[in-house]
Amino acid sequence: MIYRIKNAVIAALILLCAQAGAASLSDIQVSNGEQQARITLSFIGEPEYAYSQDGKRTVALDIRQTGVIQGLPLQFSGNNLVKTIRAGTPKDAQSLRLLVDLTENGKTEAVKRQNGGNYTVIFTINADVPPPPPPVVAKRVESAPRPTEPARNPFKSSDDRLTGVTSSNTVTRPAARASAGAGDKVVIAIDAGHGGQDPGAIGPGGTREKNVTIAIARKLRTLLNNDPMFKGVLTRDGDYFISVMGRSDVARKQNANFLVSIHADAAPNRDATGASVWVLSNRRANSEMANWLEQHEKQSELLGGAGDVLANSQSDPYLSQAVLDLQFGHSQRVGYDVATNVLSQLDGVGSLHKRRPEHASLGVLRSPDIPSILVETGFISNHGEERLLASDRYQQQIADAIYRGLRKYFAAHPIQSAPQGGPGQTASTNQPGAITAAN
């Protein structure tokens, strides 16, 4: 569940004593993403409300209502825009106040909608546009896809010749780190979204996203491990919480060649249905590249040969920038192509919400050295799709579709293992932008 926006949908328990003739607050839902969040208040009767934002990181929501809202404060992971929702001091005895604490500066808008005698007020909070990356980070220049080629990968250059960065420096790190993974197998890290105290989205029938994602992830791992081409590993194999950054770190420790993050969608519109697949946006790629350039001590951890090059280029920020730019470009191209294959397979299982890969600023897709996709398996907020997502049969069909999409891509683009037996090794794929390290 992601930036569209969601990462947790929480129904707060309401215990309210409505005034005679006043609207009654019946539900609170929170959709929390990295760059946008929505707080939806549902009322029986037409509400009176206001909002203010004295500081850019705290939003005050005032509603004409007496009583107590139980279940507050709501604590979030801190990886997305909303950090906390808590009760504030009301402006008068006839009001309630909610204070929304943000992880970064943002602006708030509100809209009221009516459905018969029921009303919803949707507060949308958008993060301020971040400052441009440091001057050392060059903006990637890309040509827009031609209208006659709607399925063209926007991250691919005009030709498919291999682009490489070579380092002739002495590298003391074990060169096996740059190998293709478990022998000749393609290592797929499978990330089951949410977990532990973070249930993810909760369907109208009570189905929790975290339970759906781990079930599909385990089925996908079984399919991959039954295929000699693959080795499937899980970022979590139980009901516990892992931070967004921690999920990428687990995949890197497993020498993953690719990461698939599995989620279930949710939306205030309960009629929304269908699967979608998301890839890293250019905006997030540029932002992450700036972060990696600043974290010299972590650069050597990168897989695929980039770590070997960066380990010996710390005195040359322009070389570091070039390597990371190539690595991000390569990961985006591979991610988009895999996403296209997975979507074509999901189309045979159920409906698609988006027929092309979508771009988003998602933390789990942030690694430059591990191409990745995020699969929204369907809308758990829709009654029909909730029942499907909770069924073992449909979970297996989703896992099968993801597996077939992965296999179709990697059968056509096999990972090339590093030669064994000496310190000078090469790690690359037959995709443009792969990194080559020659010692």
Swiss-Prot record:
The keyword Signal applies. Residues 138-167, 415-439 are annotated as: Disordered. Disulfide bonds: none annotated. Residues 188-407 form the MurNAc-LAA domain. It holds the Pfam family Amidase_3. Gene3D superfamilies: 2.60.40.3500, Zn-dependent exopeptidases. Its EC number is 3.5.1.28. The keyword Zinc does not apply. It catalyses: Hydrolyzes the link between N-acetylmuramoyl residues and L-amino acid residues in certain cell-wall glycopeptides. GO terms for biological process: cell wall organization; FtsZ-dependent cytokinesis; peptidoglycan catabolic process. Belongs to the N-acetylmuramoyl-L-alanine amidase 3 family. Cell-wall hydrolase involved in septum cleavage during cell division. This is N-acetylmuramoyl-L-alanine amidase AmiB. It comes from Salmonella typhimurium (strain LT2 / SGSC1412 / ATCC 700720).
